[in-house]
């Protein structure tokens, strides 16, 4: 698992109605900036700390051992989706 800073979109701007609570596992879809495709692997995010109302420090990672873990490294920026809806942006710490 990697640590990431997540910037959640406000509900009024198309984000989630409720940001996942601390230690609740969430399964969004991830698109890494610069990649042409959305990664279709089981992906997990667990918020560990709220920095502000719409910012969290979270643990992220792929569930499967054969997933492209090498793509998750410090400095990588990404977008999170729930279905086709963009809900957050983030960067790996």
Predicted regions and their residues:
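C-terminal effector/interaction modules appended to NTPase cores
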Residues: 1-93
């Amino acid at each position: 698992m990697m640590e990431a800073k997540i910037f959640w979109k406000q509900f009024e701007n198309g984000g989630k109605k409720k940001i996942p609570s601390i230690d609740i596992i969430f399964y969004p879809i991830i698109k890494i900036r610069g990649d042409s495709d959305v990664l279709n692997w089981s992906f997990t995010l667990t918020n560990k700390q709220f920095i502000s109302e719409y910012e969290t420090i979270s643990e992220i990672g792929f569930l499967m051992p054969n997933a492209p873990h090498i793509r998750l490294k410090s400095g990588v920026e990404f977008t999170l989706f729930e279905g086709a809806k963009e809900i957050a942006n983030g960067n790996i710490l």
